[in-house]
Amino acid sequence: MNRFAYVEARLSPNESFVSRDNRVKIYDGDQKTDFEDGEVVLTTHRLFWGRPGEIARAAVTLCLPLSYVISVSEETTASNFFGRKTRIIMHLHPPTSDKGPGPLDTSRATHIKLSGKNGLSVEFHSALRETLNARVWEILLTSEIIINGVASSPTLEPANDRLARIQKRTGIGGIERHLEAKAKATDENIALAFQDLSVLMAMAKDMVGVSKTISSKIRKQKGEISDDETVRFKSYLMSLGIDDPVTRDNFTSNSAYFSSLARQICEMLLDPIEEQGGMMSLADVYCRVNRARGLELLSPEDLLHACEQLSGPIRLRSFPSGARVLQLESHDDALIAVDTLEKVEAAESLAVEELAKQLGISLLLAKERLLVAERLGKVCRDESVEGLRFYPNLLLGRD
């Protein structure tokens, strides 16, 4: 990011507009920046990035001279539930001494990334490569040398060839070639869309089942869905996906990767864990997280390492039975025991499966809740041929 400078978004003499794209964010190396959802404009000499409307007003925006660019490459990442999006990686020369002030004075990164909500357009990517190959900023300098009488130098021939190629883009022939390239890009977009559609069709059945399950749960609470429940239903659907999942490729060390992954898991699961009574088994966590990450699936080992680093409102807990859960930090054993005792007293006695059905949790979590209450003396068990049941501990009421 220390190659960018703040300049007014105005074309200089002999500079021409080439292409633009919207909703673009910039990465400083592999790290995210605050420059998101902006408009990027490519000219023959520079690359501009500004907030929506800033470039049109000729306001002060970020500007990267194309002379800094060494090469361009791509990386492909997952896009929400299905499909993939492409990021552009621009490898850069060190900043020159005459560079103006910009967003950063120093940066260890030797490249930047441009990423869109659903990937950058094929047209923009193609225009960027053609512009960098043409190197018009060098051609204009060469033209000045030619005017000054040194056109006979053999070192100028490659630049003249490039100038001729640029000139071929003008006129009726240039317009026809541009329309042909645009039609080809449209065909590629349609082909990619059909690939995404096939993935969507394969997942549609599961998605419809999930939405029906959520809807039926809300309808069981009341006869009709209120406005508050509609908002809650939308929040359920929003929780099904992660816009930009944390991946190992963006980090140079395992500790930074697992720390960032732990923060994302905490943000994603805080509300669902609260709604499930303060605990969620690791099996449920694994399913929820990977369903939300789409194609960027986590291994069980990575998930466990990330959960072990949780230190905020959620923490990893191991029960004496060996079961592991994510539990709210404020949800200690005393609260679990009191809440479980209330459920047992209301029903006079409860089996594990009855408590699981009543709270809408797994059998594993229901059993651990009853065992916690038993260890604290709130309930006592009765094992018989009919199975295991828990009763209120009547000795607590004696003086």
Swiss-Prot record:
Gene Ontology biological-process entries: bicoid mRNA localization; mRNA transport; protein localization; protein transport to vacuole involved in ubiquitin-dependent protein catabolic process via the multivesicular body sorting pathway; regulation of apoptotic process; ubiquitin-dependent protein catabolic process via the multivesicular body sorting pathway
GLUE N-terminal domain segment(s): 1-94
Main location: cytoplasm
Domain of life: Eukaryota
Tissue: Ubiquitously expressed in the ovary.
Keyword Transport attributed: yes
Domain named GLUE C-terminal: residues: 111-144
Phenotype seen when the gene is deleted: Multivesicular body sorting defects, with large amounts of ubiquitinated proteins detected on endosomes. Bicoid mRNA is mislocalized in developing eggs.
UniProt entry keywords in alphabetical sequence: Cytoplasm, mRNA transport, Protein transport, RNA-binding, Transport
Pfam families in the record: EAP30 (PF04157), Vps36_ESCRT-II (PF11605)
InterPro entries xref list: GLUE_dom, PH-like_dom_sf, Snf8/Vps36, Vps36, WH-like_DNA-bd_sf, WH_DNA-bd_sf
Compartment(s) of residence: Cytoplasm
MF terms (GO), sorted A to Z: mRNA 3'-UTR binding; phosphatidylinositol-3-phosphate binding; ubiquitin binding
CC per GO annotation: cytoplasm; endosome; ESCRT II complex; late endosome membrane; neuronal cell body
Functional note: Component of the ESCRT-II complex (endosomal sorting complex required for transport II), which is required for multivesicular body (MVB) formation and sorting of endosomal cargo proteins into MVBs. The MVB pathway mediates delivery of transmembrane proteins into the lumen of the lysosome for degradation. The ESCRT-II complex is probably involved in the recruitment of the ESCRT-III complex. ESCRT-II interacts, through the Vps36 subunit, with bicoid mRNA. This interaction is required for the anterior localization of bicoid mRNA in the developing egg.
Domain notes for this protein: The GLUE domain (GRAM-like ubiquitin-binding in EAP45) mediates the binding to the 3' UTR of bicoid mRNA.
Complex and partners: Component of the endosomal sorting complex required for transport II (ESCRT-II).
Family: Belongs to the VPS36 family.
Protein name in the entry: Vacuolar protein-sorting-associated protein 36
Protein encoded by which gene: Vps36
